[in-house]
Amino acid sequence: FKRKTRKIISVLAGEASAAFSVAHGQPAAFDARVCVLPNEKLVVDYFRWRHEDAHRNALNAHCYWMLRKKGESVSRATDAVSGLTRAQKHDLLFENSINFNELPAWQKRGFGVYFQTTLKEGFNPQTGENGQVERQILHTDFELPLGDDYGAFVLERIV
């Protein structure tokens, strides 16, 4: 798509929705967004906030769905999770044999997709020589760093 951002994001969200729906036999929808921010600091802050937000949402979702699987209604499960501290949510899961800290990182904080430079063997038809060329490929990272390390990780990819 020649890096047309909105098109790429639209296609990725649609592909994720379709794949998840087919795999689980029920409709699902994923969204994506583009945010134009005026400087690097705000970009890093935004991504750090999204990273923490993903963690909060995952903890809430694990608590909610654990309660739903135990037979709680939508409203009772929602009410039971609402107002609990982070520690109380961890305890609730642990009491039900779920150690949130041992879940895969991508389930707790999401994952990253970004361009990565790779070397590829090639042939130059004009010179008749073999050689290596640099190419940009999309890389999926399921083990993102935390805290300040995550901020440095984001900054490294935007400058």
Which residue stretches match the model-derived regions?
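Regulatory and interdomain segments flanking nucleotide-handling catalytic cores
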Residues: F1-V159
